Amino acid sequence: MGVVVAVHGAGGGGWEYELWRPVFQEAGYVFIANDLQPSPDGLAATRAEDYLDQIHSWIPQHERLILIGASMGGLLALKVAELLPPAALVLINSLPPSDVAESRPLKTYPPIIEWENGPLAETQAALFDSDETIVQWAWPRWRNESGAVLQQLHGPFPVQRPACPTLVVLGEQDHDIPYQTGLRLAQWARADLHLYAGMSHVGPLLSRRAAEVARTTLAWCQARLL
């Protein structure tokens, strides 16, 4: 069938796709969702280019590729698609390119954003549409993130409009990246759109409806790649 390469969001890991993996594997896809690693010089020295190089290394040659990215991973996936055009691209509550995002003061990030070992209440608030089992499972898995990477991605970070079939998946109750931003991204990318009412930022991947979202996304991929 082909290969799915899924890129996680800031502070997360490949584990974020744990509920999506079996849906695509049962349909015959190889599903790759690795953890992005800090550079050898440490997390504070890690740049977007380090992550992009890693994603490139995950992609097998001569395979039909579906590229998926969530949040930070969405913008990284858009950039990867410039050099290694996939057969299809899926952007989940994605950070937008700088020329698509609404104008706002540039936020300054610390060298390391500390999310590891955060309070359980923060995970419960973020995953309000997940069941308690998933909340307890996700809570110890959050990690610290490179502030420099997010600084780059929130600054001037130009990307080309994707040339392949593209799907934008949005949670209507995303409190990190408002869904209206995703609507602008979908318009810019000339993408199809799946908007889920009442769903959180991480909800497409980890909410009670995550398997449903995965199946609907799989059906879209299969229909667009006929």
Regions found by a protein language model. Give the residues of each.
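Active-site glycine-rich loops that stabilize anionic/oxyanionic intermediates
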Residues: 9-13, 71, 172-173
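Flexible "cap/lid" loop of the alpha/beta hydrolase fold
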Residues: 82-116, 149-156
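Conserved alpha/beta-hydrolase "acid-adjacent" motif
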Residues: 175-181
